[in-house]
Amino acid sequence: GQNFTSDKDLYTDSR
């Protein structure tokens, strides 16, 4: 899924 920490800086996904 999409797990955004703050903005679109650090996101844990399979991108």
UniProtKB/Swiss-Prot annotation:
This enzyme's EC code(s): 1.11.1.7
Cell membrane as UniProt keyword: no
Cofactor: Ca(2+); heme b
Gene Ontology biological process terms, A to Z: hydrogen peroxide catabolic process
GO MF assignments: lactoperoxidase activity; metal ion binding
EC top class named in words: oxidoreductase
Calcium among keywords: yes
Reaction catalysis annotation: 2 a phenolic donor + H2O2 = 2 a phenolic radical donor + 2 H2O
Keywords assigned: Calcium, Heme, Hydrogen peroxide, Iron, Metal-binding, Oxidoreductase, Peroxidase
Disulphide-bridged cysteine pairs: none
Cofactor binding: number and manner: Binds 2 calcium ions per subunit.
Residues annotated as transmembrane: none
Role according to the record: Removal of H(2)O(2), oxidation of toxic reductants, biosynthesis and degradation of lignin, suberization, auxin catabolism, response to environmental stresses such as wounding, pathogen attack and oxidative stress. These functions might be dependent on each isozyme/isoform in each plant tissue.
Family: Belongs to the peroxidase family. Classical plant (class III) peroxidase subfamily.
Name the UniProt record assigns to this protein: Peroxidase 9
Organism for this UniProt entry: Daucus carota
Native organism taxonomy: Eukaryota, Viridiplantae, Streptophyta, Embryophyta, Tracheophyta
